[in-house]
């Protein structure tokens, strides 16, 4: 009954605060652990326990949306649905996740997955719904979860002072609202072993690392390599072709930028 309890508490919170502005963060265990689908969903997906809890998550989101609708709050409520990392299939649990995929490809064409520096590890779903302020659209802009903080502060005309408040968060409100399809000038990412990568424009650089290439439990490629890695993700989203050797000038540019970010000397212009 975990999902039912969490969903019930969320709905109660919304009802309690329906007459005033409110912020609610709701996390779910469904696509993490424990994966325990309610009897309403157990065996219904045809994809085992993992598929069943995804159905349960879908129900949970629907319950929250229905509550907002019933209170006439949906049009002027900002609703964000996102994840903290990319997918993992076999993470050590005996739930037949691999055997029952039935052709489903959680990573699509992207390399790696959860824990990884590659795109399937850091590229996540990010859905924003706000009928009163956002026209439906699909964005390919570069955007970081870290920037949600400063972007919402900008929406509220709330200055982030002192400068020590969320210093890495940048105002990306135009992108958040679907009005800018460019987004950040760069985004820094980190894998399980603290190996950093940086994306700027169409280029992605992963710093050299002597950490393990594969996570032993999940058999996931981590993106660690003793040599620098450079990918043009606009034409090579699967990160199959490391072009660091043929584009040394771009390796130098992005590695220098990454070192500046590490040293706190470059927070980006947007």
Regions found by a protein language model. Give the residues of each.
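Short, solvent-exposed turn/loop segments enriched in Gly/Ser/Thr/Pro and often Arg
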Residues: 25-34, 81-89, 168, 187-193, ...
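Intrinsically disordered, low-complexity polar regions and short flexible loop motifs
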Residues: 236
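Histidine-centered active-site microenvironments of extracellular/periplasmic hydrolases
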Residues: 34-37, 43-47, 66, 70-133, ...
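A long, amphipathic alpha-helix that forms part
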Residues: 1, 5-14, 40-77, 101
């Amino acid at each position: 009954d975990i999902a039912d309890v969490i969903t019930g508490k969320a709905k109660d919170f919304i009802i309690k605060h329906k007459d005033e502005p409110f912020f609610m963060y709701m996390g779910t265990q469904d696509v993490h652990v424990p994966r325990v689908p309610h009897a309403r969903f157990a065996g219904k997906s045809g994809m085992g326990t993992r598929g069943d809890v995804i159905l349960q998550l879908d129900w949970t989101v629907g319950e929250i949306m229905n509550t907002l609708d019933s209170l006439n709050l949906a049009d002027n409520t900002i609703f964000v649905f996102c994840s903290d990392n990319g997918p993992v299939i076999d993470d050590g649990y005996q739930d037949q996740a691999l055997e029952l995929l039935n052709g489903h490809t959680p990573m699509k064409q992207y390399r790696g997955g959860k824990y990884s520096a590659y795109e399937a590890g850091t590229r996540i779903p990010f859905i924003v719904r706000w009928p009163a302020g956002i026209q439906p659209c699909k964005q390919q802009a570069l955007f970081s979860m870290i920037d949600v903080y400063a972007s919402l502060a900008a929406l509220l005309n709330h200055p982030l002072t002192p400068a020590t408040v969320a210093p890495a968060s940048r105002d990306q409100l135009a992108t958040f609202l679907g009005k800018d399809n460019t987004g950040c000038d760069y985004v820094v990412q980190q894998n399980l072993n603290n190996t950093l990568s940086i994306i700027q424009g169409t280029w992605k650089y992963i710093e050299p690392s002597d950490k393990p290439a594969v996570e032993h439990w999940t058999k996931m490629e981590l993106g660690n390599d003793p040599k620098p890695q450079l990918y043009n993700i606009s034409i090579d989203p699967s990160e199959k072709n490391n072009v660091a050797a043929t584009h040394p000038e771009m390796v130098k540019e992005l590695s220098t930028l990454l070192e500046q970010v590490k040293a706190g000397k470059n927070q980006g212009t947007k």
